[in-house]
């Protein structure tokens, strides 16, 4: 019937490569992240609500630095946060459709660019049953975390493409800003922010309506209407 949602045409995005964030973009790790920050906030008398507003998509060291006026040792607190996340027993699952999408992509045309450390990133990707990337950029690899574009520029370079020819897939404001600062196209996941909060950026709730093919040297991402 004309005018219904099903009549909306599909959107196609053609790029050389895809740069995926991990937490909230490929895996749902919200329970583990919230559990760690709840304990850390209680430990230092920090308001949990305000902490959760600023932490998403950023490295542990940057969050520890943000509250360094409380007088603790930043390196020690960063190590505590990392260890708590590594050992948290909360389940880690894929964002719906993520595994199927990744398996449909040429392995040399996608990377994971995450604010997690390498040990945690590999652990979560495996726990969610996702294929491991050939290129993995983590908190260990960069001097400046998101929203600085360094990580996305590095991911694109390791794949062999300019960032301007890549698509960044992200759910967090810091990551979306970093992708844009790198000069990449961006596609947001509405797993953290609402569609209204993400507008006017293109966004999807998950990957169940997203397919990919490889044609004429380009990854063609097709988003159902």
Show which residues each predicted segment covers.
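N-terminal helical cap/lid subdomain that shapes the substrate entry/recognition surface
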Residues: 8, 12-106, 117-119, 130
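Hydrophobic residues in well-ordered beta-strands that form the structural core
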Residues: 28, 112-114, 188
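Asp-based, Mg2+/Mn2+-dependent phosphohydrolase catalytic module
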Residues: 2-16, 99, 109, 118-225
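Residue-level marker of regulatory loop/turn positions in helix-turn-helix DNA-binding domains and
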Residues: 94, 113, 144
């Amino acid at each position: 019937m004309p005018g219904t949602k099903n009549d909306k045409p599909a959107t196609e995005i053609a790029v050389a490569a895809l740069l995926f964030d991990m937490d909230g973009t490929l895996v749902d790790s919200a329970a583990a992240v919230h559990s760690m920050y709840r304990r850390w906030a209680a430990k230092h008398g920090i308001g949990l609500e305000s902490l959760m507003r600023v932490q998403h998509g950023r490295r542990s060291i940057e969050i520890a630095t943000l509250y360094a006026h409380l007088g603790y040792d930043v390196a020690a607190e960063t190590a505590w946060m990392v260890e708590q996340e590594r050992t948290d027993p909360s389940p880690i699952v894929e964002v719906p459709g993520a595994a199927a999408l990744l398996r449909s992509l040429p392995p040399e045309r996608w990377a994971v660019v995450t604010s997690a450390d390498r040990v945690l990133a590999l652990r979560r990707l495996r726990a969610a049953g996702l294929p491991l990337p050939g290129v993995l950029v983590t908190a260990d690899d960069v001097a400046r975390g998101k929203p600085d574009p360094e990580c996305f520029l590095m991911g694109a370079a390791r794949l062999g493409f300019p960032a301007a020819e890549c698509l960044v897939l992200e759910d967090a404001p810091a990551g979306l800003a970093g992708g844009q600062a790198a000069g990449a196209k961006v596609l947001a996941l509405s797993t953290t922010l609402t569609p209204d909060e993400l507008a006017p950026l293109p966004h999807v709730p998950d990957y169940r309506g997203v397919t990919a093919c490889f044609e004429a040297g380009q990854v063609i991402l097709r988003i159902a209407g």
